[in-house]
């Protein structure tokens, strides 16, 4: 490709509305342009990267035995009503109508469509297992699209769906998809972790997220410093302290704390160690309970894990925090003064709180706290559960090492769905015993457009993108200095361009009438891994300057050796 016949569209300045580095660099490198909130046009450089990602995904899915299909973006509402998700999915589901006022949706996912296909196409257990995938546009009406293509409303996704007659068969395909995803992200040169995850609104019995480690990530990824254990923070178990609860050394006293409405204020004003404080959070109780609210207690320096809390049998789903009005109606005190002593509703405490002694908590009287509280002396030990987020340094749940926490960007997610959708849509086949058998399902997604942004978040420097070789838009950039004035430079540039292309190497020849500084800046910005610079001064010595983008190292290579050198670097 020649720049004179290409839309480079690079920008010198960073657009003001671009928050994260991938959004900034994708705009500056001429990869995308914003059309409307959460909607982007992909320009030639972006499309080239996108296709590289797609191709790797497609190759590994095919290698794993999955079969490619293509389903409509527009889906009839009847399928969503049949599955129950028409009401459940919420405002992210974009509902539309055709000219006959028949309701449809723009597909955010395709479980209903593929299950409908299978229930009409398959009839016998002998046809299974089967795993279908597509690479298709999705639309989710995000309330606040942000971070460019990282959280856009329209995006490209690889979604796969497998069908089975047994849990054992599902597990085999699930394991194959786990391995395929690991190969996909390894081939792309990404630093990632596969972590145990909550199944969320998709449902099912088991799931793993594939997280690209990056400081800008929205998820906390937890992993052991010595073993293979890894989990999303929502699912990571906080192990109970091994040490027995220390004996009481203080009497419980009622203390006036009129200006201490938060743990931070309490700690600062009364010089308390934060690990000797407890915070109390009130949430709605499950429907039918004899109490309207449930009190959840975690240590002052810990955070409530809302996913764990929602799974408590006493707690309403979705988890809903009580308003101040609701709290006062039950406890007769405000949110800053709550604690376990004389709490008139059910209490659940975290494992760490159960191991505390001589601690401070609200007195359930406005502007007052109890100091020196001890379990079973001042208040009976309530129900104990794991309801907090783990923190760095906690013991690993597998008993090996301690936990580290890094930020991650979710680029893939695999689920064991079970029979959730097949039961709702009555997808069954004749089993081996001759009876009708509901199908067991798995689903497996990769955010193709998000992978591009995540790769940038992991691979950039002050000059621009530093693509992993496997997904770079071009493999080699040829920069001929003063090409339009030097016949020797022009002739060599054309010769090398032809020879490299003949070797199957993707080359961008910068044949613009631009200053060298502009040419260098653009090639570094768009992140082409290998650059060769042709100039009269080096050619006097039969030399060509070669530069590797990732480490910035330069070297002079003889003109006659440059093609073989590049082929070796790229193809090994």
Curated annotation (Swiss-Prot):
E.C. number(s) listed in UniProt: 6.1.1.15
Main location class: cytoplasm
UniProt record, GO biological process: prolyl-tRNA aminoacylation
GO cellular component term, pick one: cytosol
Tree of life domain: Bacteria
Record's catalysed reaction(s): tRNA(Pro) + L-proline + ATP = L-prolyl-tRNA(Pro) + AMP + diphosphate
Assigned keywords, A-Z: Aminoacyl-tRNA synthetase, ATP-binding, Cytoplasm, Ligase, Nucleotide-binding, Protein biosynthesis
Gene Ontology MF term list: aminoacyl-tRNA deacylase activity; ATP binding; proline-tRNA ligase activity
Subcellular compartments: Cytoplasm
Subunit text: Homodimer.
Function: Catalyzes the attachment of proline to tRNA(Pro) in a two-step reaction: proline is first activated by ATP to form Pro-AMP and then transferred to the acceptor end of tRNA(Pro). As ProRS can inadvertently accommodate and process non-cognate amino acids such as alanine and cysteine, to avoid such errors it has two additional distinct editing activities against alanine. One activity is designated as 'pretransfer' editing and involves the tRNA(Pro)-independent hydrolysis of activated Ala-AMP.
NCBIfam families linked: PRK09194.1, proS_fam_II
HAMAP family hit by this protein: Pro_tRNA_synth_type1
The record's note on its domains: Consists of three domains: the N-terminal catalytic domain, the editing domain and the C-terminal anticodon-binding domain.
Family label: Belongs to the class-II aminoacyl-tRNA synthetase family. ProS type 1 subfamily.
The protein's name: Proline--tRNA ligase
UniProt source species: Escherichia fergusonii (strain ATCC 35469 / DSM 13698 / CCUG 18766 / IAM 14443 / JCM 21226 / LMG 7866 / NBRC 102419 / NCTC 12128 / CDC 0568-73)
Encoding gene, per UniProt annotation: proS
């Amino acid at each position: 490709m020649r720049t004179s016949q290409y839309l480079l569209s690079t920008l010198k300045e960073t657009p003001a509305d671009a928050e994260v580095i991938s959004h900034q660099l994708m705009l500056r490198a001429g990869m995308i342009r914003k059309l409307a909130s959460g909607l982007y046009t992909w320009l030639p450089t972006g499309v080239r990267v996108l296709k590289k990602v797609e191709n790797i995904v497609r190759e590994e899915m095919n290698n794993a035995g999955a079969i490619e299909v293509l389903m409509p973006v527009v889906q009839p509402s009847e399928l969503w009503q049949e599955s129950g998700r028409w009401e459940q999915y919420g405002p992210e589901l974009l509902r539309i109508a055709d000219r006959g006022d028949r309701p449809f949706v723009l597909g955010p996912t395709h479980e209903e469509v593929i299950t409908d296909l299978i229930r009409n196409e398959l009839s016998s257990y002998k046809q299974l297992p089967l795993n279908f995938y597509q690479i298709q546009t999705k639309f989710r009406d995000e309330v606040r699209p942000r971070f460019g293509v990282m959280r856009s409303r329209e995006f490209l996704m690889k979604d796969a769906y497998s069908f089975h007659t047994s849990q054992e068969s599902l597990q085999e395909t699930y394991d194959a998809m786990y391995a395929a995803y690991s190969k996909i992200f390894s081939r792309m040169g990404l630093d990632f972790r596969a972590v145990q995850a909550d199944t969320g609104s998709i449902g099912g019995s088991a799931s793993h997220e594939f997280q690209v480690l990056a400081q800008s990530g929205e998820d906390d990824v937890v992993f052991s410093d010595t073993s293979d254990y890894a989990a999303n923070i929502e699912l990571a178990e906080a192990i109970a302290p091994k040490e027995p609860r220390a004996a009481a050394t203080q009497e419980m006293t009622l203390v006036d704390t009129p200006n201490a409405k938060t743990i931070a204020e309490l700690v600062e004003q009364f010089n308390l160690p934060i690990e000797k404080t407890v915070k109390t959070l009130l949430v709605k109780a499950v429907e039918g309970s004899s109490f309207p609210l449930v009190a959840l207690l975690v240590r002052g320096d810990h955070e409530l894990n809302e996913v764990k809390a929602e799974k408590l049998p006493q707690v309403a789903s979705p988890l809903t925090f009580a308003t101040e009005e609701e709290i006062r109606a039950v406890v007769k005190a405000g949110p800053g003064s709550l604690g376990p002593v004389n709490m008139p509703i059910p209490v659940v405490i975290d494992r760490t709180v159960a191991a505390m002694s001589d601690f401070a908590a609200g007195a359930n009287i406005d502007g007052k706290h109890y100091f020196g509280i001890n379990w079973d002396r001042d208040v009976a030990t309530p129900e104990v559960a794991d309801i907090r987020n783990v923190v760095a340094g906690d013991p690993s749940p597998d008993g090996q090492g301690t936990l580290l926490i890094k930020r991650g960007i979710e680029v893939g997610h695999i689920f064991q769905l079970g029979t959730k959708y097949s039961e709702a849509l009555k997808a069954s086949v004749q089993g081996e015993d001759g009876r009708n058998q509901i199908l067991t399902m798995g689903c497996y997604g990769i955010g193709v457009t998000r992978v591009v942004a995540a790769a940038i978040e992991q691979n950039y420097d002050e000059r621009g993108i530093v693509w992993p070789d496997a997904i770079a838009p071009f493999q080699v950039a040829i920069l001929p200095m003063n090409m339009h004035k030097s016949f020797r430079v022009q002739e060599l540039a054309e010769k090398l361009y032809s020879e490299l292309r003949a070797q199957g190497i993707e080359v961008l020849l910068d044949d613009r009438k631009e200053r060298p500084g502009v040419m260098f800046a653009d090639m570094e910005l768009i992140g082409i891994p290998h650059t060769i610079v042709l100039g009269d001064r080096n050619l006097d010595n039969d030399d060509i300057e070669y530069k590797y983008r990732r480490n910035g190292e330069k070297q002079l290579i003889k003109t006659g050796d440059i093609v073989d050198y590049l082929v070796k670097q790229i193809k090994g």
